[in-house]
Amino acid sequence: MNYTSYILAFQLCVILGSSGCYCQAPFFDEIENLKKYFNASHPDVADGGPLFLEILKNWKEESDKKIIQSQIVSFYFKLFENLKDNRIIQRSMDIIKQDMFQKFLNGSSEKLEDFKKLIQIPVDNLKVQRKAISELIKVMNDLSPKSNLRKRKRRQNQIQGRRASK
């Protein structure tokens, strides 16, 4: 290979790498495999409208959208868990789960483990229900907006700093 061929090969690698097409093609192929396996083009799939797409359209803010996405990702993880013994589609599910893991949980294995723990908590278990109710106050406090308090303190410090400099 001469110098020009190396440069052309390098440029091709850069173009394919930056476009994202090269990386996403296997992902889309795996979704197509699952669509074929589940016969997702069957007319009854359209009955009742989409499962998730309309809901996703209703949520515009990034933080709100993350909440909905977590529930949707949870659904897919449960679906894949129920089908884990199916050898025909195992590879496709593994590739898609890995991609979801990278996109939704930023590749953090700790977040993935916590997410899996939450998914697997049985809601029909009395002991679990008791624990959940026992922790409810702390969970509600954790959900309350702390950022407003921080913003207020920051503003107060800025105002006090301006007064002191005058």
Swiss-Prot record:
The protein, known as: Interferon gamma
Organism: Lama glama
InterPro entries to which the protein is assigned, alphabetical: 4_helix_cytokine-like_core, Interferon_gamma
Record lineage: Eukaryota, Metazoa, Chordata, Craniata, Vertebrata
N-terminal signal peptide: 1-23
Region named Disordered: 147-166
GO MF terms held by the record: cytokine activity; type II interferon receptor binding
Summary of subunit composition and partner proteins: Homodimer. Interacts with IFNGR1 (via extracellular domain); this interaction promotes IFNGR1 dimerization.
Function statement: Type II interferon produced by immune cells such as T-cells and NK cells that plays crucial roles in antimicrobial, antiviral, and antitumor responses by activating effector immune cells and enhancing antigen presentation. Primarily signals through the JAK-STAT pathway after interaction with its receptor IFNGR1 to affect gene regulation. Upon IFNG binding, IFNGR1 intracellular domain opens out to allow association of downstream signaling components JAK2, JAK1 and STAT1, leading to STAT1 activation, nuclear translocation and transcription of IFNG-regulated genes.
Tissue specificity statement from the Swiss-Prot or TrEMBL entry: Released primarily from activated T lymphocytes.
Subcellular location: Secreted
A Pfam family per the record: IFN-gamma
A cellular component term, taken from the record's GO annotations: extracellular space
Similarity comment: family membership: Belongs to the type II (or gamma) interferon family.
Entry keyword NAD: no
Pyrrolidone carboxylic acid modification, residue list: 24
Main location: secreted
Keyword annotations from UniProtKB, A to Z: Antiviral defense, Cytokine, Glycoprotein, Growth regulation, Pyrrolidone carboxylic acid, Secreted, Signal
GO BP terms, alphabetized: adaptive immune response; defense response to virus; humoral immune response; positive regulation of autophagy
Gene: IFNG
Glycosylation sites: 39, 106
